[in-house]
Amino acid sequence: MVPWLGPDDPFPPVERALGATSGAPGLLAASGDLLPSRLIDAYRRGIFPWYSDGQPVLWWSPDPRMVLRPAEFKVAPSLRKTLRRVLREDAWEIRVDHDFASVMRACAQAPRRGQRGTWITADVVEAYSSLHRVGDAHSIETWFEGKRVGGLYGVSFGKMFFGESMFAEVTDASKMALAALVGHLRRHEIEMIDCQQNTSHLASLGGREITRKSFIAHVRASVEAPPIPWRFDKTALLEVVAPAS
């Protein structure tokens, strides 16, 4: 049975999450609140919220866990060509934390195959914006000719980045933001991005599944490290692909 958490109740051990044979593998708990303090505690334990509008807040810790190691990020030839153009042309920019809430709202509006609606409601935007205001959540944004055309957002503690969602209004704009993030994380020797659940898109970029036990061990060690700086631009792409000579 999935426990209901009151405002002061702690999360149960992640090992108590529902198993693979259940109707909701990885579901750990439910609650009626999405307070910033609850979010911070969740991420530092390797737990994340995901639910549909009208449901209680559902908290998850799946096994296995999808992750992307920056060192294993795959750059297809077509994307490599695009990244070189981004580096070369002044019309392209990568901005960090320029308009965090707007990136979240754009992610909420992005169409998702097999999904109706979004869990990124106004309350969710406000909760994550609270983390952003204290430096624990960040947006990486792709801009072209002064207009934001793609991006992603996530949560960061110490040497761990927890990816949440991304969007693209032009081809590969979200991949440009991800590549810049990967470059920045490589510079600071970050070993893992949490991707939560397996998708073919993430796998094509180098994502792979690891056991929950391995994931939680890495999170516990990484979140206690000193925070990294969160100011960079498109030159972070140089860590991923050298510009054309």
Curated annotation (Swiss-Prot):
Q: Name one Pfam family in it.
A: Leu_Phe_trans
EC number of the protein: 2.3.2.6
Gene Ontology cellular-component terms listed: cytoplasm
In Gene Ontology terms, what is one molecular function of this protein? Answer: leucyl-tRNA--protein transferase activity
| Subcellular location field | Cytoplasm
Q: Keywords assigned by UniProt?
A: Acyltransferase, Cytoplasm, Transferase
Per its record, the protein catalyses: N-terminal L-lysyl-[protein] + L-leucyl-tRNA(Leu) = N-terminal L-leucyl-L-lysyl-[protein] + tRNA(Leu) + H(+); N-terminal L-arginyl-[protein] + L-leucyl-tRNA(Leu) = N-terminal L-leucyl-L-arginyl-[protein] + tRNA(Leu) + H(+); L-phenylalanyl-tRNA(Phe) + an N-terminal L-alpha-aminoacyl-[protein] = an N-terminal L-phenylalanyl-L-alpha-aminoacyl-[protein] + tRNA(Phe)
Q: What does the record list as GO biological process?
A: protein catabolic process
Family in the record: Belongs to the L/F-transferase family.
Protein purpose:
Functions in the N-end rule pathway of protein degradation where it conjugates Leu, Phe and, less efficiently, Met from aminoacyl-tRNAs to the N-termini of proteins containing an N-terminal arginine or lysine.
Which HAMAP family does UniProt cross-reference here?
A: Leu_Phe_trans
Q: What is this protein called?
A: Leucyl/phenylalanyl-tRNA--protein transferase
User: Organism source for this protein?
Assistant: Paraburkholderia phytofirmans (strain DSM 17436 / LMG 22146 / PsJN)
Identify the taxonomic lineage of the organism of origin: Bacteria, Pseudomonadati, Pseudomonadota, Betaproteobacteria, Burkholderiales
